[in-house]
Amino acid sequence: MVQNKVLDSVKSDRVKVYVVWTPVLSEDDGKAADNAVEAVPDDRAMHFWDDDKSLGFSLGKTVTLPRGRKLAWDVYFVFDAKAEWGDAPPTPAFWMHQLADDERKLDGEKFKDQVLKAIKTR
């Protein structure tokens, strides 16, 4: 959804994409993550394997995930261009997920609107 609603329609080089693969399902491993790169083939995308889930847990602390979850996975963030990354990730300007059916459930059009808003404020 993010690929076709956002990346295929927003061609700006101001958009930077970081795809973090983390082991959640039993079949998740580094090889599966390598194969999954095809899911986000955009040239602006950089792919990372979060083997120990440390980034997923750090990102999970920046927002309130549904159902008391602590690990951010199937979560999509928009960060302001001025966001500073240090020992802990910054708070996102906007985010959505695919973890539950609530007001932050991923909606490609809404997410695209927030990406466009973010690149206009740069």
Spell out what each predicted region is:
Residues 1-38:
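Structural microenvironment flanking redox-active thiols in thiol-disulfide oxidoreductases
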Residues 3-4, 33, 56, 112, ...:
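Extracytoplasmic/secreted envelope proteins and their assembly/folding machinery
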Residues 4-11, 52-53, 60-61, 120:
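Sec-exported extracytoplasmic/periplasmic mature domains
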Residues 12-17, 41-46, 73-74:
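Loop/turn elements at helix/coil->beta-strand transitions in domains of secreted/extracellular proteins
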Residues 22-27, 51-56, 83-85:
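Solvent-exposed loop/turn segments at secondary-structure junctions
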Residues 29-31, 59-60, 88-91:
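Short, solvent-exposed loop/turn and secondary-structure capping segments
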Residues 37-69:
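Short, internal strand/loop/helix patches
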Residues 71-122:
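Thiol-/selenol-based redox modules, centered on thioredoxin-like
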